Amino acid sequence: MAFETFSVALDKDKTLIFETGKIARQASGAVLVKMNETWVFSSACAASLSEAVDFLPFRVDYQEKFSSAGRTSGGFLKREGRPSEREILVSRLMDRSLRPSFPNRLMQDIQVLSYVWSYDGKTLPDPLAICGASAALAISEVPQNCIVAGVRVGLVGGKWVINPTRDELSASKLDLVMAGTASAVLMIEGHCDFLTEEQVLEAIAFGQTYIAKICDAIEAWQKAIGKQKNFSAVLDMPEDVQNVVSDFIREKFEKALSFRDKEALEQASKELEESVIANLVQEENSDFSLLNVKAAFKTAKSNQMRALIQDLGIRVDGRTTTEIRPISIETPFLPRTHGSCLFTRGETQSMAVCTLGGENMAQRFEDLNGDGAARFYLQYFFPPFSVGEVGRIGSPGRREIGHGKLAEKALSHVLPETSRFPYIIRLESNITESNGSSSMASVCGGCLALMDAGVPIKAPVAGIAMGLILDRDQAIILSDISGIEDHLGDMDFKVAGTAKGITAFQMDIKIEGITHKIMEQALAQAKQGRSHILNLMTQVLASPKGTVSKYAPRIETMQINTSKIATVIGPGGKQIRQIIERSGAQVDINDDGVINIAASTQESINKAKELIEGLTGEVEVGKVYNGRVTSIATFGVFVEVLPGKEGLCHISELSKQKVDNISDFVKEGDKLAVKLLSINEKGQLKLSHKATLED
């Protein structure tokens, strides 16, 4: 393929440049996307499957090369290895944006790889990665139903900003990443400072205009240079197979839908599927293959569930479309943790635990912008027993990381300033039961655990997951969706926030986009559900506890002059290690001179403060010091009153009586109380022990 390029101007100094034909020419599709000096490369390749499967084997891997920012990994191994949390989150964003664009029953193994090759420290690469991956797929042989593009939207100074720079984003009240087609939205994810539903909708509409512009440009490029699409890899569903399967299960599945609990419904559904396979699969007839029959069974189940909702307004568990599952809350739940809550909504349960600590508990990370440390982080755990299964235990998967980060963003906007609450905060959400919406249960349980721990949050936060049944030109929004509604429905729209406004949101769909009107209805219904949940939460715990747990460490801060930081640290950290050893406290010094002292007892904190003040304090005339005799002369003794601050106590100032032999009165190394009488023009200190006796 010859070198080809096109560009899309989004705003001043924000032009997307797409290039192909120079790099990775053996890939099915390969595109380099540039904006300023940030360059992101994306490739798309597909392979035939050795056997047909009932899912789409599609994988996206995004990697940020440290060399792109002129850096090298700080670890022992300098080669990029396991993906970072950020790389996993961006990979998920790309996957969720692109997956709805593929035809149903596409029998290909598809891989998209994206690399940040150059990073200017200003232009954020994730929207470029979505656009580049979409363009690479568009010009490849991989079949798609639609063209996709992605953008980021910010709100800076009351104005919407497209693809905000890093500096603009730090000042923004909104961080929204969204993807869609030229006419509809496919994926959104973001967090914000208590924006209203109307503002979020306005932001999405703003971003959609730019998405349409990029999609139109990619589509024109595809028509001009794209390869022939391989639609032969898409399996059709024979109409008679679907009809036979639907007729076979109609009455039986209607009976199964009468079961109101998850376990009974799943068991009945499993037995029905086994019956369908045993009775309808025909080895001699390829139309009635195992793959086709199983796919038809899933479609038939979905259609019956939808019909129940559309015709009767009743869901599989008996609820109405706006009804929230029963909620129970127990806080505190665990006796020795700093804060805890057992939050149960229907058959979804989160045991949330809050742990408070000093600076050494911060979550360290390394990315293209340098090293950092998170003062608040939420870790989500989804053990297999939560859904009654046997499974792998180990490092978190992409789903766990994504769910945890969404809940973390939802709660981060209500946390107090560090100056008011200097603790590092770790939240963990242990999912002990799951039947849909476990990430939003993590938000609710996590919020209550924070309040139980005495974290002075600005307001309680609750979360809810919304679903969609889109059929017969009718859109039905479902509140607080269960697992089967997520699995068989068309949308999963999670919204979290306070009574005042939204703090986080995430939407994934399984169809080719939804309209502004549907999102407006979903957000309005989510607000009603959120208000209901918040009301139940505040009935149990109306406000944060006034004090932290007696089991939490005590933390105090003190301010020193920045010129004294080196004195406190000492050569090679010798001085600060001595302070930690002598006091038993954890001491952390910031570049601005703020010192955080954490310990299990107040005595340890007081000791650490005393030692630090001794190193950094300035001498005051008239103040009494418990000094140390450093040397003895015939005319007096030299006494160190503060580290590095030494003065002379003349022999006449040692006692009210005459002292003939100083060595008989005091020895080198002895402690001696002295009062600072004066400081001469040379900075020399005049001390008196006699004055302390007079006092």
UniProtKB/Swiss-Prot annotation:
Keywords: Cytoplasm, Magnesium, Metal-binding, Nucleotidyltransferase, RNA-binding, Transferase. Mg(2+) binds at residues 486, 492. Its cofactor is Mg(2+). It catalyses: RNA(n+1) + phosphate = RNA(n) + a ribonucleoside 5'-diphosphate. InterPro entries: ExoRNase_PH_dom1 (IPR001247), ExoRNase_PH_dom2 (IPR015847), ExoRNase_PH_dom2_sf (IPR036345), KH_dom (IPR004087), KH_dom_type_1 (IPR004088), KH_dom_type_1_sf (IPR036612), NA-bd_OB-fold (IPR012340), PNPase (IPR012162). One of its GO terms (biological process) is mRNA catabolic process. The keyword Cytoplasm applies. Its main location: cytoplasm. Signal peptide: none annotated. Residues 622-690 form the S1 motif domain. Residues 553-612 form the KH domain. Pfam families: KH_1, PNPase, RNase_PH, RNase_PH_C, S1. The keyword RNA-binding applies. It is found in: Cytoplasm. GO terms for cellular component: cytosol. SMART domains: KH, S1. One of its GO terms (molecular function) is polyribonucleotide nucleotidyltransferase activity. Its EC number is 2.7.7.8. HAMAP family: PNPase (MF_01595). PANTHER family: POLYRIBONUCLEOTIDE NUCLEOTIDYLTRANSFERASE (PTHR11252), POLYRIBONUCLEOTIDE NUCLEOTIDYLTRANSFERASE 1, MITOCHONDRIAL (PTHR11252:SF0). Belongs to the polyribonucleotide nucleotidyltransferase family. Involved in mRNA degradation. Catalyzes the phosphorolysis of single-stranded polyribonucleotides processively in the 3'- to 5'-direction. This is Polyribonucleotide nucleotidyltransferase. The gene is pnp.
